[in-house]
A protein has these predicted regions:
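Helix-rich C-terminal or lid/interface subdomains of diverse kinases
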Residues: 199, 203, 207-244
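Protein kinase catalytic-loop region centered on the HRD/HxD motif
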Residues: 157-163
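ATP-binding glycine-rich phosphate-binding loop
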Residues: 9-31
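A glycine-centered beta->alpha junction motif in the catalytic cores
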Residues: 81-95, 131-139, 222-236
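Catalytic-loop of the protein kinase fold
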Residues: 164-166, 171
Length: 244
């Protein structure tokens, strides 16, 4: 159906401007019901979109700042691979204090998603100790030595409790104001050990002690290497994962 599906949000619904940052999706600012919003068109399955939409609604009810699905005229969360979400104001984190606020927000996300089901088709880092594939990850495409290093990093997370992790808390996906921290772009969100989020933060923002920080940083670097393999960023992240 493509962008023609935008008409399901009303006769006046229209695309405004293409937005940067969408790798797996076509992302635009849109106007729906006279309000600015964001439209995202991609190839995700209905089950995947339902998981994400349900999560975002739950986070909104829990008081976390994140995009919220805008329903079609007939009450659907998405249609034809298109999801429309509220526009989130704010800028990226710049200071160490900003990043500490991000860490607090991620911990709030982890607290309110206990028992959340796994995103359809995804696997956690500890699942990949034995599995070879899971949505964005294909360990068979990596050199065997790289797989050994990644699995050694993830093995240190074995037995930990799992929650929903954002999966990609980089500055482009964070919108700060003086009042709150919002997380956008939930494409990489799934159920995993919270260390994957916390280990990705700069400046020691998560406040972990030395050993815990090392475990989190190694696991996060291994995850990003595997998810992005094999672009230059993935190679860079793999270089941060210690050899076994």
């Amino acid at each position: 159906m493509g962008w023609e599906a935008l008409g399901l949000w009303g006769e006046d619904a229209a695309r405004i401007e293409k937005l940067a940052g969408g790798v797996a999706n076509d992302v635009w600012s849109v106007r729906v019901g006279g309000k600015l919003a964001v439209g995202r068109l991609g190839q995700r399955s209905d089950a995947d979109l339902a998981w994400e939409a349900g999560l975002l609604q739950h986070l909104d009810r829990q008081g976390l700042a994140a995009p919220v699905p805008v329903l079609t005229i007939d009450g659907r969360l998405f249609a034809g691979g298109l999801m429309v979400m509220t526009f989130v104001e704010g800028g990226p984190p710049k200071t160490e204090e900003d990043w500490r606020r991000v860490a607090d927000t991620l911990r709030q996300l982890h607290r309110v998603t206990e028992g959340w089901p796994q995103r359809p088709g995804w696997r956690s880092s500890t699942d990949l100790l034995t599995a070879d594939t899971g949505t964005r990850i294909d360990l068979t495409a990596m050199p065997p030595e790289a797989v050994v290093r990644c699995r050694a990093a993830w093995a240190r997370l074995a037995g930990r409790e799992t929650r929903v992790v954002h999966g990609d808390p980089n500055p482009r996906n964070i919108r700060l104001t003086a009042e709150r921290v919002a997380l956008i772009d939930w494409d990489e969100a799934h159920v995993d050990v919270p260390d994957l989020d916390l280990g990705a933060l700069p400046h020691g923002a998560a406040g972990l002690e030395a050993t815990a920080r090392d475990i989190a940083a190694q696991a996060s670097a291994a995850w990003e290497a595997a998810v992005c393999w094999k672009d230059d960023y993935a190679v860079k992240r793999l270089a941060e994962v210690r050899a076994v």
